[in-house]
């Protein structure tokens, strides 16, 4: 499955990925109309300090703790991506507490929001990746690490 991979060596901390994400998920066709004088609610965010910055978004884990924690069944896997059923989300924030990466946040209307890889936007790649001027975000598929038997493990 393709995922977003940040490269902190190339991230300038410009936050353009956040703006492109907010615009792509705004439903507007005009960026100025979508973002001017409004608080943005991106599904990706830039973290770091003066030494290093990087973009943080949902990792779409193979065994997501957020789905297990969701009491309303609003989170589910779809083609490998963790997706939200906004009509089912009750805003309890149990998934926010369960996510070890802090990639889920409460949105402006009380329900949660997280990166859904722009799968519903039909752009071919997430807007944050397409908009990053320094190519600090990559949308690619990496081979899953093979599980190996530990040395000295007993077998029957």
Annotate each predicted stretch with a short phrase.
Residues 5-7, 27-72, 86-156:
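Flanking helices and flexible, charged tails adjoining ferredoxin-like Fe-S electron-transfer domains
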Residues 12-24, 28-30, 43-44:
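A positional/architectural concept
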Residues 1-3:
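Extreme N-terminal starter segment of soluble prokaryotic enzymes
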Residues 79-80, 142:
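Short glycine/acidic-rich loop motifs that flank beta-strands on beta-rich extracellular proteins
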Residues 77-78, 108:
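Conserved C2H2 zinc-finger inter-finger linkers
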């Amino acid at each position: 499955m393709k995922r977003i991979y940040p490269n902190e060596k190339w991230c300038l901390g410009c936050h353009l990925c956040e703006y492109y994400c907010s615009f792509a998920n705004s439903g507007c066709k005009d960026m100025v109309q979508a973002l001017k004088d409004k608080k943005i609610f991106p599904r990706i965010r830039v973290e770091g300090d003066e030494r290093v910055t990087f973009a943080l978004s949902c990792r779409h884990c193979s065994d997501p703790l957020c789905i297990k924690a969701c009491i309303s069944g609003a989170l589910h896997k779809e083609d490998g991506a963790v997706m939200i059923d906004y009509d089912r989300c009750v805003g309890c924030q149990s998934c926010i507490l369960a996510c070890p990466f802090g990639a889920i946040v409460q949105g402006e209307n009380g329900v949660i929001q997280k990166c859904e890889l722009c799968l519903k936007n039909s752009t071919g790649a997430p807007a944050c990746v397409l908009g990053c001027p320094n190519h600090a975000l990559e949308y690619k598929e990496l081979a899953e690490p093979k599980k190996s038997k530990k040395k000295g493990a007993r077998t029957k």
